[in-house]
């Protein structure tokens, strides 16, 4: 008589809450493997405590002078730094508190973030700390969305604060898959598409200048433009050796690389004006192949609230402008997102300009 293997993923119960005497520590980063990183320099988390049923407090430290960094000159933090911090959080909580085995792949389904416009957490601490490492606390609530023998789904809601001041919120939904199931799902997603040329960009493509996407150097530029293409059409310029976006080997285009490309695309469409992205709601549909071109398209949406509307609520920022951004490979949509952003002329009302 044959017997089936025991279920790998059960309706797990999180570990018991920590002692009231235990306080979050910001002293030492977690081991890289705890958040699926290869380099210790790319780890933001320093501690995590359970404070209730499926409720956690997580400590992180953001360092300056790095890609995906907080700006020490008083501008709002890069939203993707917050997203990456929460991505590391969902991985660590899944392993440490919910018993998900190491080596089981995580698949991101959707995410949403909102930055509180005008909040500048790097300015809220004492003078000597400004421009230095920034201690961040996440108030996290997890919700289990389903479990089968080879699949475990969860959702997360995280509110980020510095010195008790809220500055953003992130929601994510993901699944952990048994390695065998992941291999099956991954193989099914492989599509016949034209290969990407190796080496230099094709002659018809021009890599964007760093200033078009908010950087001083071209090391971080992820977009190229067809010389005959429309304003909002770009190609992903993959950088497999990038120490942050490709910290460890992957069999697909990373979600963080695509989100950073989306942010750059919105900035490029608004150039020379510098857009500030404050909202994004993205759905991940399928895996992107590493050896085939990825097109990034920006479709402008609403222009946000008018100045007269803003005058009716002088202590609040204008509503953001919006754009629909998609990443396509062949005939498959990899990711689609609605992005909310402000241009400099929008940031002249209320607390945004303070």
Residue ranges and their predicted role:
Residues 51-53, 104-108, 165, 229, ...:
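A generic structural signal for short, non-catalytic loop/turn and secondary-structure boundary residues
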Residues 145-193, 316-354:
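Mixed-charge, glycine-accented linear interaction segment located at domain edges/termini
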Residues 111-165, 277-333:
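Hydrophobic beta-sheet segments that form the core/acyl-binding groove
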Residues 1-74, 175-245, 309, 352-354:
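Non-catalytic linker/capping segments at the edges of enzyme domains
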Residues 58-64, 102-114:
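A short glycine/small-residue-enriched secondary-structure motif
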Residues 77-105, 253-275:
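Active-site helix/loop of acyl-thioester processing domains in fatty-acid/polyketide metabolism
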Residues 226-293:
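Intrinsically disordered, low-complexity segments enriched in Gly and acidic/Ser/Thr residues
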């Amino acid at each position: 008589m044959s017997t089936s293997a025991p279920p790998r993923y059960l309706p797990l119960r999180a570990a018991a809450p920590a002692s009231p005497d235990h306080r979050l520590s910001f002293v030492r980063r977690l081991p890289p493997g705890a958040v699926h990183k290869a380099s210790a320099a790319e780890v933001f988390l320093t501690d995590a405590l359970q404070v209730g049923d499926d409720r956690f407090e997580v400590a992180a430290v953001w360092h300056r002078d790095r890609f995906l960094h907080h700006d020490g000159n008083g501008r709002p933090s890069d939203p993707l730094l917050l997203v990456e911090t929460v991505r590391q959080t969902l991985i660590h909580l899944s392993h440490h508190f919910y018993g998900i085995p190491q080596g089981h792949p995580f698949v991101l389904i959707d995410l949403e973030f909102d930055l509180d416009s005008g909040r500048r957490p790097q300015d809220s601490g004492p003078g000597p700390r400004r421009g230095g490492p920034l201690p961040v606390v996440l108030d996290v609530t997890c919700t289990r969305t389903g479990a089968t023998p080879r699949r475990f789904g969860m959702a997360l809601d995280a509110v980020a604060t510095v010195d008790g001041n809220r500055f953003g919120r992130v929601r994510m939904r993901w699944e952990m898959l048994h390695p065998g199931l992941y291999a099956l799902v991954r193989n099914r997603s492989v599509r016949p598409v034209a290969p990407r040329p190796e080496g230099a960009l094709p002659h018809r493509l021009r890599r964007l200048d760093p200033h078009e996407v908010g950087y001083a150097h071209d090391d971080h530029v992820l977009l190229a433009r067809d010389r005959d293409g429309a304003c909002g059409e770009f190609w992903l310029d993959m950088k497999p050796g990038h120490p942050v976006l490709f910290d460890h080997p992957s069999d697909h285009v990373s979600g963080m690389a695509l989100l950073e490309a989306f942010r750059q695309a919105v900035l490029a469409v608004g150039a020379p004006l510098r857009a500030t992205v404050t909202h994004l709601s993205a759905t991940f549909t399928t895996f992107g192949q590493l050896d085939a071109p990825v097109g990034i398209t920006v479709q402008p949406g609403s222009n946000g609230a008018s100045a007269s509307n803003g005058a009716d609520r002088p202590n609040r920022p204008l509503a953001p402008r919006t754009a629909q951004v998609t990443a396509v490979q062949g005939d498959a949509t990899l990711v689609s997102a609605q992005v909310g952003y402000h241009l400099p002329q929008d940031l002249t009302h209320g607390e945004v300009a303070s």
